[in-house]
């Protein structure tokens, strides 16, 4: 019997709705990965509602929880670590301590960093120290880096002038250490308004993918978290980076189709679960080079 992969997911959690681990854990489980959720914050709901309750996990709890797993002899079974929203830079450094601990036991373990830097216009606010940590420390340790356009701009220190400029900015990130950069949302001058575009960049090649942009009265939250989680899950299940990229685009689109059909503000993960595991749509990425 083929072994089921195990993944430690260290990011935010909301009691109601879907963001962070609440957007990523169930879909990763649904495609066949055992997920160990470690919640960096626990909020009542995501911050775009304008109000929320909850608290940030104390940084020292992260390595303590990792050591607790080690104490029962299970840490070596961890095949990958996913990190997302951070409440503080100290939390981020605690995560890197955990990543190093896991990689010392299992050198093949992968680390995907979703460098959430905040989007004030959407109500997602991240302290500057977190952005600095992601730029200066986390990127160097990550096997996979999954920024959106705003985060890519922050890494590059500028805005793109074209699609090929986005590609150049993502390629420059490879020099910081990651094996691959997945840009979860592209935005650049001249981009067609009816499409949603993503980019995968590796040392071996780069691919661009465009899918239809769906209209919502209020844009659902958690799409980036869902994207990062599914991409890493599919890699653990044996997909090539390109196959994982294309599968993720299809599965995320299926979730958004179901969410749109329900006129829902929250992602309809449960209703779309079969389509997450077995997408009916398919998107083919196009090779792109400078």
Swiss-Prot record:
NCBIfam families: PRK05756.1, pyridox_kin. The lineage of its organism: Bacteria, Pseudomonadati, Pseudomonadota, Gammaproteobacteria, Pseudomonadales. It comes from the Bacteria. It comes from Pseudomonas fluorescens (strain SBW25). CDD domains: pyridoxal_pyridoxamine_kinase (cd01173). Keywords: ATP-binding, Kinase, Magnesium, Nucleotide-binding, Transferase. InterPro entries: PM/HMP-P_kinase-1, PyrdxlKinase, Pyridoxal_kinase_PdxY, Ribokinase-like. It is an enzyme of class 2 (transferase). ATP binds at residues 114, 151, 184, 211-214. Homodimer. Its cofactor is Mg(2+). GO terms for molecular function: ATP binding; magnesium ion binding; pyridoxal kinase activity. Pyridoxal kinase involved in the salvage pathway of pyridoxal 5'-phosphate (PLP). Catalyzes the phosphorylation of pyridoxal to PLP. GO terms for cellular component: cytosol. Substrate binds at residues 12, 47-48, 225. Belongs to the pyridoxine kinase family. PdxY subfamily. One of its GO terms (biological process) is pyridoxal 5'-phosphate salvage. It catalyses: pyridoxal + ATP = pyridoxal 5'-phosphate + ADP + H(+). Disulfide bonds: none annotated. Its EC number is 2.7.1.35. Pathway: Cofactor metabolism; pyridoxal 5'-phosphate salvage; pyridoxal 5'-phosphate from pyridoxal: step 1/1. This is Pyridoxal kinase PdxY.
